[in-house]
Amino acid sequence: MSTIIDVKNLTKKYGDLTAVDAISFSVNSGETFGILGPNGAGKTTTLEMIEGLKGITSGQVLLDGINVHERPRDVKAIIGVQLQSSSFFDGLSLKELLETFGALYGRRVDAMSLLEKVQLVEKAKSQVKELSGGQKQRLSIAVGLVNDPKVLFLDEPTTGLDPQARRNLWDLITSIKKSGTTVVLTTHYMEEAEVLCDRVAIMDHAKIMKLDTPTNLLRNSGVDSTIEFHVDKKCAVDHFKSLAGVAQATEEDHTFRLISTNPEETLPALFAHEKEHGFNIFNLQLRQATLEDVFLKLTGRSLRE
């Protein structure tokens, strides 16, 4: 599989603040590549440097063999970037909007075909202000496709959407990938990364902590299961850290979470601990590891923090 993006020691500093710290990775042609991390991790800055929209402090980005920061105009001709709805021209219909963006690339655009691809044909004569949040996001992706890009960049594409609109957008992104377009996206939704991405880079505090397929990240994390529960008395989380099989114990919003490498050992130990210390456990759930758990083990905090 050929490499379409090659990032080497990419760094961005603002005075004493390091926003992106010497990260390196590659993206394969035709894959959906995700950068997963909380707000402030450096995801958007990384994307903007790869797109050529933000200068770099040091390092190098090659996109389809082109040095992004030496030949930014050549790069912009082969990439698509998701725009925010505030970037759109007021007073134009969706059809006129796509044709206008096409003209900026010197291309004659089949606007209706693009609108069909993003399931907005019935809104062709509407203006952006008349669209729902999910429809605006689909339009922004259509704009990113006007130049038939080799790589489409999506920055937090489903933030703020309701669950159904989010899943509709996932279907759209999957169809774009199936058409042969490489997709690079950032997200702080672990389920989104698991569903959409062939490979995921977990990013925190300006660094890439781990990079692999979602399956391998889960398999090699050393995290097999998570036990979540509430108790009817005030308990310190330290109560549970020494239980058999517990790799990590945390408490958030009155929910205790035990990351266990062996739940068959941990559960009996937990129930014995309950009996010994005179509290009652309720709302107990046992679930398989997710990328949220992998992130927690790597960083010691949740994606929401």
Task: Provide a role label for each language-model segment.
Residues 1-11, 301-305:
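ABC-family P-loop ATPase nucleotide-binding domain
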Residues 4-5, 12-210:
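ABC transporter nucleotide-binding domains
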Residues 73, 218, 296:
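A short local structural element in Rossmann-fold oxidoreductases
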Residues 80, 102, 106, 201, ...:
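A generic structural signal for secondary-structure junctions
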Residues 98, 111, 214, 237, ...:
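Generic structural marker for isolated residues within well-ordered, non-membrane alpha-helices
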Residues 171-261:
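ABC transporter nucleotide-binding domain
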Residues 223-301, 305:
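Short, charged/small-residue-rich alpha-helical element at the C-terminal edge
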